[in-house]
Amino acid sequence: TPGVTTLEDVAWWMSDQQLTRGLGSSFDMPSVYITGPEGIVATSSDRIIQRGDLLMIDWGVGFLDFYTDMKRVGYVLREGEIEAPSALQHAFDQALAARDIMKATIKPARTAGDALEVMWDAMQAGGFNRAEFNQPSDDPLVTDVVVGPHSVGNWGHGLGPSLAFFNPTRMTYELRPGTLISIELFAFTSNPDWGGAKVRIPLEDDAVVTSRGVEWLYPVNRRILLIK
């Protein structure tokens, strides 16, 4: 309920739902956070959710010794709104376009690092800028992207090969067919409604590596979740 519910209320509710269903957790407390012109505002705290907030959820569940890692994006509608502002939708669409390239180009390789470079060649050819974590460029005409695909399965962040900046050693592992990975990215797109500050859109869902690219393990979400 806008104006009443806090971020930690949502996080605890999600945890309760996991326990009720007999599911484990990949990361203990889910991360429920708000993103604004200054970046991440608050995470799973007593911050009250307001209309116009852009919400992100990062969590994972466990079942039969299999663990997931996923993200979702939601927007709290203002009075009279029936959809997210066009600038936020554009930022989300840019993130989807970047993810589509990742999905098509991540394939088995001698090392995960080799697969990463092939993927980035395609991403940059598609007009996306390679950025450092949470350090987007000042160029309002480009969408900056940070990628973090990593293994999943035995845990939310698994023990296998990784294309993520935070697992440099695992970039040296062979990326084989059948490897389970999360397709994770953060896309930063300029938002005129925020004075040109860039919107941080995180996307993450789980997939299996094949010779055709990667295939989703389940139907993935392709829209901003609208909260009334």
Question: What label would you give each PLM region?
Answer:
Residues 1-228:
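Active-site neighborhoods and metal-handling regions in enzymes and metal-associated proteins
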